[in-house]
A protein has these predicted regions:
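Structural detector for helix-capping/boundary residues
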Residues: 15, 35, 52-53
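Short, intrinsically disordered low-complexity segments
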Residues: 9, 35-40, 48, 66-67, ...
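A short, Lys/Arg-enriched interface patch at domain edges and termini
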Residues: 53-76
Length: 76
């Protein structure tokens, strides 16, 4: 169980995350399965809901990865 309660305001649908990240829904689903995004299946239809903070963490990770790649290319 997470250390913090998850409120409905902090949960996003697959489509919302796909739009925010300019990805296909299938790509967002893959990120969930890879553990790069945090989410859960809710409701009787068991639809995915993704933690908003997880999206921010993913973006931060992508920025850091880009920064490191840039530094690596500069050093070569």
């Amino acid at each position: 169980m997470p250390d913090h309660p998850i409120s409905a305001e902090r949960l996003l649908t697959l489509a919302q995350v796909a739009e925010l990240l300019t990805l296909d829904v299938d790509d967002v689903l893959a990120l969930l399965h890879e553990g790069r995004l945090r989410g859960t299946r809710l409701g009787t239809a068991a639809q995915w809901r993704i933690e908003q903070s997880s999206v921010g963490d993913y973006v931060d990770d992508q920025i850091e990865e880009t920064r490191r790649m840039h530094l690596w290319h500069q050093s070569n």
